[in-house]
Each structure stands twice: as structure tokens, then as C-alpha cells.
A protein has these predicted regions:
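Conserved alpha/beta-domain cores
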Residues: 1-151, 157-159, 167
Length: 167
């Protein structure tokens, strides 16, 4: 959304925003976040390794940690991750066109993230396949979360938010 829309939202009392791209978020939110500490910015799109440091400096929540290379980049900037939240992206549909680890790799990858990389993993995230019932994938993610002692889920696109609220 354009900056004008963001400013209107802030004036209406909205302080939580999501962005798909680091560069677009920098253009809109770099100054806004300095002026308004209530703003919480979520990265919902894929992250390239060369954008990790600027992303950590700007965003508060990361929904798409999905591979070892990015985890290693995050780990380099651990000191900047205080009060940041990270979700591990799980490809519950095992789609070749989507990012995320496969469900059966979740436990081992979480161990790597937490023990070796020392990253604060808050939750799990999934984007269900477009032609599948999202509830099946939300259930699968919830089970993985329970098995791995994780409390938070990032689930549901706009068209499935009502179903996501059940979890």
C-alpha cells in the first residue's frame, strides 16, 4: 500500500503492518518507525541473504525463515534480534513452488535454529496449497507446534482468516 494509506491507518489507530519486501518497507517505514515507536512491522515475504541485516534493523517479526543459509545470516546479527520474533516457515503441502521446510524436518531444523544458531524461534508459519482445504494444513502445523513446544502460529491468507482463527 502507498505511504498515504499507511499514514491514514496510523491516524486511525492501526500500528501493526506487514510487508513482503525489505526495500519497499524501508522506503515507507524507516522514518515512520523512528517517529512512532508503537509501529510493529512484520516481514511476510521471502528474505534474501543480502537483505538480512537491513531487515533485522527494520522489522520486528519475521514470518518466513525457511532455510539454513538465512538462519546463518540471522545468527551473525543475534545481538540485533533482542525483542524480535521469528517464525519458521513449514511447507505443509510439500509444494515445489513454495519455500519452507518439509514437516518431517521440523524437529531437526528447530534444534539447529535454537541450539546451534541460538535464534529466538517463536512460532511456525505455513501457506496452504491454494486448492487444498486450509484446515488440514493448519491442523498439521498445530500438531508440529505442539510436538515442538511452540505456542504461536502464523497461518491463513486473507481468504482463510476465519478458519485460521480456530487455531
Amino acid at each position: 500500500h502507498p505511504l498515504k494509506s499507511v499514514l491514514e491507518a496510523i491516524n486511525a489507530g492501526v500500528y501493526i503492518f506487514g510487508e513482503n519486501r525489505v526495500q519497499e518497507a524501508q522506503e515507507k517505514f524507516q522514518k515512520l518507525k523512528l517517529d512512532n515507536t508503537k509501529i510493529e512491522l512484520h516481514l511476510t515475504g521471502p528474505l534474501q541473504s543480502n537483505k538480512v541485516k537491513p531487515a533485522i534493523q527494520l522489522f520486528d517479526v519475521f514470518h518466513t525463515l525457511d532455510r539454513e543459509k538465512i538462519a546463518r545470516e540471522f545468527s551473525k546479527y543475534r545481538k540485533l534480534l533482542v525483542n524480535k520474533k521469528i517464525f519458521l516457515q513449514v511447507n505443509t503441502g510439500k509444494e515445489k513452488t513454495k519455500s519452507g521446510i518439509f514437516p518431517e524436518d521440523t524437529k531437526d531444523f528447530l534444534f539447529f535454529l535454537r541450539q546451534e544458531m541460538k535464534l529466538p524461534i517463536l512460532g511456525l508459519m505455513c501457506i496452504p496449497p491454494i486448492d487444498d482445504d486450509p484446515v488440514y494444513h493448519f491442523n498439521k502445523l498445530k500438531l508440529l507446534a505442539n510436538e515442538n513446544k511452540i505456542d504461536e502460529l502464523s497461518i491463513g491468507m486473507s481468504d482463510a482468516y476465519e478458519k485460521a482463527l480456530q487455531f
